[in-house]
Amino acid sequence: MIRRAKLSITFGVAKAGVYILFLNFRRHRLVLLLIGLAIIVGASLPPFMTASYLTRQQTAAEVRALESLRIMTRGGVLPSEDVVARIESDFPRTKAAALARLIRARIRINAKDFAGAASLLDSSVIGDHSLLADYALFMRGSALEQAGKLPEARAAYEQLLKSYPTSLRAREGALRSANIMLRSGDAAAAPALLKDLAAKDDASALLLTAKAYEQAANSTRALAAYRRLYFYAPAAAEGAESASAISRLGSTVAPAKPDEALARADRLYEAKKFSDALQSYNEAVAKFPAATNSQAQLRRVIAAANTRKIADALNALNAIPASAGDTRAEALYYVAQTYARTKQWDQARATVEELRRSFPSSPFTPRALVSVGQIAEDANNEADASYFLRTAVNSYQGSVEVAQAQFDLAWMSHESKNFSESSRLLTEHLAYYADKNTDNRGRAGYWAARDSERAGKLAEARALYEAMQIRYDANWYGYLAKQRLDAMLRGNKAPAKSFPSDSVVGRAFANLQTVTVAEETAGAKEDKAIATADELNNAGLDDWALEELARASAAVGNSPKVNLAIARIYRFQEDNVRALNVLKKSFPDYSQMKPEELTREQWDVFYPLSYWDVIVQESRARNLDPFQVAGLIRQETVFMPRARSSARAYGLMQVLVPTGMLTAKKYGVERTITEESLYEPRLNVQLGTAYLRDQIDKFGRIEYVAAAYNAGPIRVVQWRTSLPSEIDEWAEAVPFKETRGYVQGVVRNRLQYMRLYDVNGKFRPEVGMRAVTGQSPASGAPATQPEDSTVHKRRVSGDESEE
């Protein structure tokens, strides 16, 4: 009936000021709901939003005016110009005035009053009082261009290039100026303007350069530009024009030199167009055999592996000498995987053995053993899987590359009910691998304890159950561990025992206590980008804001500060899933962090809570725990009221129209149930909680209910009879990975909401009090981290996470 949206996984906004009152927002009810929420925002905004970058302190009234502008322009909406003009006049020579002027220009552009927009933008107010002078200049050029004033537009674009060469709008300004040159009969001037972009093989710049030369009757240079486009930017859409143009100018697309041939192949490879890349590499090798080096042959191997062309992969591998070291090792790694994926196990084993023999110290050797073993495991080839995984673990003990293999071996022992062996291996995983790779840490922690208990190692079991309460108390495996620990203590089955810190259990205990956060890598340049993005968001230009932050992120990786700024914009757009996913790159272990260790804004991204009054009312009406309902909503949609799944489920609790109709009829809800009505939070929660009540009455345990909500009640009826009866084993045995994660998530989310929020839906006092990044909610002072902290700061890739 209800299906989870296909989502990978608000700000309280504040009273927006009197200017909103002038707006007719009947068509925008969401905006009206936000009015009355900029005093709170003004108090919670980061420093760059509450103090001018020009060192002038903003007044409370100006902060409210800025938030009014932000809310007015939310979601692409443009208000009445009169309201915005009033803000501009009431706050002269301020950021509010500058952004109001920019919004007024947007309003006129939207009304096709391009000359009026250009006139508004012909002022120093935006440049003097905001960070958006380059954007204003670009918008002025665009308005002039649309008004047909091409010379003035060209001058504006070229002024942008001169004054703000590093602006994100500079490239587009150059392209537009060049287009104007071609349209105005001044094509000969375009190549010089585009020289820097063309030198970077910018496809649009190369195409315009070629067209400019062709229009200027310089066919030699036109052909050179088209060929450059064909060979050096083949993956771009503009590249499609180059082949026909080359033919039209009397030439062919055959490479004239090795650099051209390899450049085309490399660019296609970088764009992951592996089939085309392989063809280009093969052509390059055939025509210029002496010019292809080992790195090119490696890329040829990888392209062939991705298209499962084993013969091409072997030809390329044979061209890489042993003296190439890790380059040949990496090639062997890909060839071994290709053999495994095509179930040529003998050849896969021979390739891996060559790696072990020739490159025993290369990181690609353990990676090959593990990846081939996992491919065998997925293919139900237990013999080869066991061989490769055991060889990896025995040969590279303690190496991060074999962490997953070691866990897989431990799990094989668990599934074969060899609890003495599985408990040993799982505890060793915690002791020797979990500090390097936390992918399976919580799972290993619980099952190491559970299997130790089954094997009669009660002291070890108790110690590990207790360790799980430190960081996993609000997570699925900590929830299970708490139940087992309570049972042990009630029965007085295991006296407390202290294990030496250097023992296996002692190391395991210690490794269950740590979490990782990304170290802060942002500096002054990124701070300015964040401030610029905030001003763009304030003016309703979210796409440009996200471009600014994407450039900052590319420079500094997973900076918590930059990722929070990105998440802040997504939250403002009510795209809570994207907000969560971007911020967790900086906090991969966020669900194991204590309430005081993250700021309230960070927790609000990870565990948003909206419509609390509705949730409480409807939960009480159905005798449900409102925190459980909130946990289910978070798992379904992360509180996105207009979420829609591929299964055509709608709204916060993902209700299907047919089921909504049946539920409404059963419970006397006198509403017409449609797709649009299911987006209404109250109706959706009313129907969702009614359905949830039915499922609880039917299945009892929330674990079964969650599985039914995600995979359907019929499957759960079958699973309850065919899968293990104990709930911990049952949840592991559910055949759908998505449903396993869903069950765990629903339980985890309830525990998280209970520890973060009080019964009124407000953060508990301790939340954010000792945040490892950001500021203390009480003092506003930078947060400090104690020397003995179990929070480890390091650079993170953004790929690691465990919930």
Task: Please name every model-derived segment.
Residues 673-683:
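A short, structured beta-strand-centered segment in the mid-to-C-terminal lobe
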Residues 2-14, 18-653, 657-666, 672-673, ...:
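Acidic, polar-rich low-complexity tracts and alpha-helical solenoid repeat scaffolds
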Residues 739-740:
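Short, flexible loop segments at boundaries between secondary-structure elements
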Residues 701-702:
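Short loop-to-helix capping motifs
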Residues 712-714:
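Structural signature of outer-membrane beta-barrel domains
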